[in-house]
Amino acid sequence: MKIGAPREIFEGEARVAMTPDSALQLQKLGHHCVIETGAGMKAGFSDEAYAAAGVEVLPSAAALFEAADIVVKVRGPERAEAERLRRGQTLISFFWPAQNAELLELCKEKGATVVAMDMVPRISRAQKMDALSSMANIAGYRAVIEAGNNFGRFFTGQVTAAGKVPPAKVLVVGAGVAGLAAIGTATSLGAITYAFDVRPEVAEQIESMGAEFVYLEFEEAQDGAATGGYAAPSSPEFREKQLAKFRELAPEMDIVITTALIPGRPAPKLWTEDMVSAMKRGSVIVDLASERGGNCDLTVPDQKIVTPNGVTIVGYTDFPSRMAAQASTLYSTNIRHMLTDLTPKKDGVIHHNMEDDVIRGATVTHDGAITFPPPPPKVAAIAAAKPREKVKELTPEEKRAAEIATFRKQTVSQVAMLAVGTALLLFVGMYAPPSFMAHFIVFALACFVGFQVIWNVSHSLHTPLMAVTNAISGIVILGALLQIGSGNVLVVLLAAISVLIATINIVGGFLVTRRMLAMFQKS
């Protein structure tokens, strides 16, 4: 089948749904790729690059819609684009079906199948197709870069000959994909980073990234997690505590990045006008929720404004498009994974399996019918765990008796082994020469000490332990090499085996050491 990517006609959109690299992968599935001329130009992909990847470049959108069996886009289709769809054709793009009922109806009437990338279920198997997370990751990163562009100081603290520069203080509100990306970027730039989220389970994630989680003093336990990893609306009491905490933090923060969204609702207002007034001159607010009304009272969508007290508020809604090359690469990879699932036999034929949770969840029209909203994903039933028998609590006297019994058992075992070993040594000593006994005793002690040392090493330290054994193996191989010149055939054979085994250990040890050290290198 032919997969076509038209040029995005939404104003300011620079992304493209197919890159030369993704086109090569799609062709391996048996598909033929076409693209409208100039579609990838804003993202840095020329028509020549597509042609070199085996993609047919068509002169117009009309020609592309006519030729393609599957149309891949970034933005949802404009009405003029939807009018070009035909029965049996498949459209894969962001669609937002809940907000575009008329467009959904038009696609149904046209008989086209629409796969909405924003409707991909939030389940583990579908992570490779989760375009929302891919774009949110870019938005969080770009938000910090945009804040730094409008902030008049360093992120990291510095001590210079000209004086001391304090580090910037950054507050990230909302620790979803975009929020975590912003936290990671701000922390890596050296800023003192704080983060807040209504879901208490993300506190550990935030702290593991080097940021400080902002806790609220709230009597009732508030869990703001909803289905799909999103946040749920907060209670009025919790919201008041939340706003009070933000008012307390506002005068201290240099940069505030807000990312809070609730599915199907306008963005919650979390940074009020009085908080903006309390911020220092030169501070920056980046509102990633501006497309849904914004988390800040003063946000103006698609604009950057400066308040009378000198606070810059960035309300851009096209952060991923501002990194068009990277965004196009990630989005086209998400599209490729979706098409891989739609082409299970890799024969260039789409098989739209509506029994598949991911495909069913993302499909909003199919066979002339609207299939939105989808049913909840099927979850495999898990058998209830058998109740464990309660372990009887031992009294101090019973614990003491058990410890004594264990000690006696171990003592008897060790004394018996010692007696047998002593008898064996005496027996061998009666017939063996003194030189042999000296070597044999050293060997026995080495085995005993080595066993005790290795046995008591924690499992987590076995990898560095393998690296250290290179030195021991080096001693073994030297001893074996000295014995290879012996006139005894048996000694030579044993020495050769020793060299082989020690060599394997040395090579393996160096390999493990290399891999262990590579974990600490920044790629």
Curated annotation (Swiss-Prot):
The keyword Transmembrane helix applies. SUPFAM superfamilies: Formate/glycerate dehydrogenase catalytic domain-like (SSF52283), NAD(P)-binding Rossmann-fold domains (SSF51735). GO terms for molecular function: NADP binding; protein dimerization activity; proton-translocating NAD(P)+ transhydrogenase activity. One of its GO terms (cellular component) is plasma membrane. Its EC number is 7.1.1.1. The keyword Aminoacyl-tRNA synthetase does not apply. It catalyses: NAD(+) + NADPH + H(+)(in) = NADH + NADP(+) + H(+)(out). Disruption phenotype: Loss of transhydrogenase activity. Sensitive to aerobic methanol, but can utilize methanol as a sole carbon source in the absence of oxygen. Not defective in formaldehyde oxidation under anaerobic conditions. Increased specific activities of other NADPH-producing enzymes. Has higher levels of glutathione disulfide and increased sensitivity to oxidative stress agents like diamine in a succinate-based minimal medium under aerobic conditions. CDD domains: Rubrum_tdh (cd05304). It is a multi-pass membrane protein. NAD(+) binds at residues 127-130, 177, 197-199, 229. Its main location: membrane. One of its GO terms (biological process) is NADPH regeneration. Residues 1-411, 456-464, 511-523 are cytoplasmic. InterPro entries: AlaDH/PNT_N, AlaDH/PNT_NAD(H)-bd, NAD(P)-bd_dom_sf, NADP_transhyd_a, NADP_transhyd_a_C. Belongs to the AlaDH/PNT family. This is NAD(P) transhydrogenase subunit alpha. It comes from Cereibacter sphaeroides. The gene is pntA.
